Each structure stands twice: as C-alpha cells, then as structure tokens.
C-alpha cells in the first residue's frame, strides 16, 4: 500500500513539476532549480545578502541558491557551498562535496571559511522523504538543528540565517532555539513554495551568541 501511495505521490509531483510556472521560469533564466526563486523572494523582503559578504550555503546542490547568492555578494564577496551530492561548478562559488556531519568534512568546511566569521548561513536542506511523517519529520528537524549548530560555529555577530523548516513535531522548540540566538526571527512562506508543502522559511537576523 505504501508503495502505491509513493508511486501516486511521485506521479503527482512529476505532473506538477513539469507544469510548474517556476520550473519553466527557472529554465528560461538558466537557473538550476525553482528553489532559486524562494531565496530571491526572501532577499526582496529581508535584504539578507549584500555585496562583499561571505555566505555559507548548506545543502546547496543543484545550486539554485548559490547562483542567487554569488550574484548578490559580487566580486568582493564569497560563497562557500556544501552538499553530500555533487554540484556542477558555479563561477565564484567554492563548493565542497561531503557530509558535514563527518568530522573531516566539517574541518574542510571550516578551513574554507577561515579565520573570519561569515555574514549569512543559508540552509535549504531536506531529507529524502519516505512519505511517513514519523520518519521524515525527525530527519528534517535533525538537519535544521545541524544548520543552527553551524551558525554557532561560523556566524559573525549580527549575522543572518535563513533555513527551510517543515512544520510539525519539534517546530516550536526549534523556533524557540532560533529566537534565543537571534534578535529578530520571521516566518516566511514564499509564493514559489508549493501551497500544499509544510515547508516554511525562518529568516533570523542579528545573531547574538
């Protein structure tokens, strides 16, 4: 039964994907994923990224957010991207392939960051979905907790954090933890986020720890 559900869900996703306005627009603009529009919308509302900034992009593949970020930081800025999956090169983006939960990958990422702290941490990470909330939600919350931990390691005072979170068990506790670490936290649901998705984005500014 679960296999049939996943097949039906996969078929629905495929139909939505190929008939999706944002997918078509991404292809037209040469963007690697529709997710790029989510960061563009967050940027329009919250002005997270400015020229000259250093940005860390977690869960970067296939590169939609990195494409947007590297244009925003300009020639004097820096984008450091990391993903367990491979990603085709993007000019101006320093990409590290690996699982940053592993010590050697984390060390390599911190080496790329260097002595200076970063201005923005981005995370559009999501687990491979099984279709079971009891499995998927804990996995998703684990990833966002890792992203917040990365902020504690690399983010400069008054830095910013944008993270995709799935509403469900653990969300309220996570929101509390983010509010403890940042002066201002806003919840955003970009127009380019599918309406039926439980995903929202927390935009946190004014890092204070």
Curated annotation (Swiss-Prot):
EC id: 2.1.1.166
UniProt-recorded Gene Ontology molecular function terms: rRNA (uridine-2'-O-)-methyltransferase activity
Listed Pfam families: FtsJ
Cellular compartment(s): Cytoplasm
Active-site feature positions: 164 (proton acceptor)
Enzyme class of the recorded protein, top EC level: transferase
GO CC term, one of those recorded: cytoplasm
Domain of life: Bacteria
Substrates-to-products reaction catalysed: uridine(2552) in 23S rRNA + S-adenosyl-L-methionine = 2'-O-methyluridine(2552) in 23S rRNA + S-adenosyl-L-homocysteine + H(+)
Protein residues bound to S-adenosyl-L-methionine: 63, 65, 83, 99, 124
Keywords recorded for this protein, A-Z: Cytoplasm, Methyltransferase, rRNA processing, S-adenosyl-L-methionine, Transferase
GO biological process: RNA methylation
Signal peptide: none
InterPro entries listed in its UniProt record: RNA_methyltr_RlmE (IPR050082), RNA_MeTrfase_FtsJ_dom (IPR002877), rRNA-MeTfrase_E (IPR015507), SAM-dependent_MTases_sf (IPR029063)
UniProt key word Nucleus: no
Function statement: Specifically methylates the uridine in position 2552 of 23S rRNA at the 2'-O position of the ribose in the fully assembled 50S ribosomal subunit.
Family to which the UniProt record says this protein belongs: Belongs to the class I-like SAM-binding methyltransferase superfamily. RNA methyltransferase RlmE family.
PANTHER family found in the cross-reference section: RIBOSOMAL RNA METHYLTRANSFERASE, RRNA METHYLTRANSFERASE 2, MITOCHONDRIAL
Protein name: Ribosomal RNA large subunit methyltransferase E
Source organism (scientific name): Shewanella oneidensis (strain ATCC 700550 / JCM 31522 / CIP 106686 / LMG 19005 / NCIMB 14063 / MR-1)
Gene giving rise to this polypeptide: rlmE
